[in-house]
Amino acid sequence: MKWVVSFFSIFLLNFSESRTMHRNAYGIASILDSSQCSAEMNLVDLATIFFAQFVQEATYKEVSKMVKDILTVIEKSTGSEQPGGCLENQLPAFLEEICHEKEISEKYGLADCCSQREEERHNCFLAHKKAAPPSIPPFQVAEPVTSCKAYEENRDMFMNRYIYEIARRHPFLYAPTILSLAAHYGKIIPLCCKAENAVECFQTKTSLITKELRESSLLNQHICAVMRNFGPRTFRAITVTKLSQKFSKANFTEIQKLVLDVAHIHEECCRGNVLECLQDGEKIMSYICSQQDILSSKIADCCKLPILELGQCIIHAENDGKPEGLSPNLNRFLEERDFNQFSSREKDLFMARFTYEYSRRHTKLAVPVVLRVAKGYQELLEKCSQSENPLECQDKGEEELEKYIQESQALAKRSCGLFQKLGEYYLQNAFLVAYTKKAPQLTPPELMAFTRKMATAAATCCQLSEDRQLACGEGAADLIIGQLCIRHEETPINPGVGQCCSSSYANRRPCFSSLVVDETYIPSPFSADKFIFHKDLCQAQGVALQTMKQQFLINLVKQKPQITEEQLEAVIADFSGLLEKCCQGQEQEACFEEEGPKLISKTRAALGV
C-alpha cells in the first residue's frame, strides 16, 4: 500500500516558483524563471476541480455554470494576448464567483464566508471542506453500457463529469493527482468497452484507481495538516530530509533551492489554488528532469513519461544510493565553534546542513526518525555549549543519538513479533485495547477503523526485509497518527492526545507510544444494554463476527480503562465459553438470555464496575 511507504515522498509531486522571484532566509533564489510560461492548461477541468472541492454539495449543473462564468471573467481580465499558462493568481476571482452566486452560497452554508474579505474569506472556505461529507454517497462507476455510450457521445463532458465526482469526494486531493488519475481512467474506458467481460474489466481496473485516490487523498490532507499545524520551519526540515534522501548526490545549495520551491507549491496546493498547483508543478518536474546528472540516476525512465505521469513516477522512484567518499558518521560536525553564539538564522542553516548530511548517509531511515536525531543533536549542542569541555561533551552525546534509531528498531521488531505470533486480527485487537485506553472518547467505528489500518500496516511492513521494516512502519504510523490528530483538530479527544498532536512533529509517534490511559476519562454509568447477547453471535461469520467481538471488547475497556491484561484475558475466556455453550445448544436465544446476565454480573464484580 502506498500510504505505508513514508508519506513524505509525496513532497516530490510538485515544486514551484512564485509569481515573483522569491528567496529563502539564506538568500538562495528559486530555481525557476517566473517569466517562463507552462504549456496550455485545460482550464475547464481545473475550474471544475476548484468549485467541486470548495462547494462539495453543489450539483454538476451548478458547478458547470460557475465554471463557465469564471472562465468568462478570466478571459476579460487577462486579455486574449496572454497565454492560458501564464495566469496570475485568480484565487480571489474564483471565491468571488461562489459568493456572486448567492443562491449557491446560501444553499450550501457558505454565506458566512462570503461576508468576510480576502484571507479571512479564503480560510473560511477552507474550513468548510469535509473529507467525507455524509450527504455525498461513495462514487459508483456506472454500468458499462451506460458509461460506454456516454463516453462515445461526448468524451470531454464524460471526463469532466468524472473529474467533478472525484474532486467533490476528495476535497484535499491535489489537482495534478486528480488530472493524472482521470487520464488513467480515460485510457481504461475504451479498453473495457471493447472487452468481452466489460463488467469484470471495469471492476478490476477501476479498483486500482479507487485505491490510489483514497491513499493520495489521505497523503495530501496529511501534508496540509502538517504545514498548517507545525509551520514552515518544521516543513522545511521534513523536506530537506526527504529530498536529501531522494537526491543524495545533489549538493546542499541545490537541495535548498528545491526546498524553497517545495514549500511554495505545497502552500498553493493546500490553499486550493489549482492553477498554480498544476502550472508550477509542471515547471519543476521539467527542471528536475533537466538536472538528472546532478540529482539522481533513478529517474531516467520517469522523465520519458507524459508530464502528468511524471510526478507520480518520481515519487515512487528509489532513493539514489549513498554517494561514494562520504564519511560514515558526522562526529564533531560543529568542530570548535560555539553553537550558542550563532544567531537564530545561523542555527537554522547549520541544522539544515546537518539534516542534509545525515539524511544522505541514511537514505533508508524514516523521515520522523531523522528529525528526532536532528532534534536530539540540536539539544546536545545547546547543552554542550554550557559545559567546561564542549568537544568531550559532544563526543559522548553523539554516540547517544543512536538511541532514536534503536527505539524505532525495537518497536518495529516488537510489532512484527506480535504480528507473527497473533496474526492480523488478534494484533488489531491488541491495538484496540491500547487505543481505547489512550482515547476512550473515540466511537467504536473510529477505534476499529484506526486500529484496522495499524494492523494492515503491520501485515504489510512485516513482510519486508528487516532493513525496510523500520521506514515502512514509521511512515505508516505517522500517517495514521496524523489522521487521528486531524480528528482531534475537528473535535478534541482528550488532553493527552492533544499534547502529542501539537507539541512536536518529530516526536508524535513516540508520544503516542508512551500514552497509556487517559486519566481524565470518567466512564459513563454501567449500561447493561451494551452487553446484551443474542443468537446472531452464533450465526455471524467472518468479518461480521469479528466486528461483534471487537464491539464487546471496546465496550468492556471503555467501562474500565484501567483493566489489566490478566483481567481482560479472564473476561475473554468467559465470553468464549458463553459462545461455545450457547451456540452448541438448540435454544440459543434462551441460553443467551439466561447465561449472558450471569457473565456480566461476574465481570462487573471482578472489575468493580
From Swiss-Prot:
Modification(s) after translation: Sulfated.
Domain named Albumin: residues: 19-210, 211-402, 403-601
This protein's name: Alpha-fetoprotein
Organism phylogeny: Eukaryota, Metazoa, Chordata, Craniata, Vertebrata
Glycan attachment residues as annotated in the record: N251
Compartmental location: Secreted
Residues at which Cu(2+) binds: H22
Tissues expressed in: Plasma.
Modified residues (Phosphoserine): S115, S344
Origin species: Canis lupus familiaris
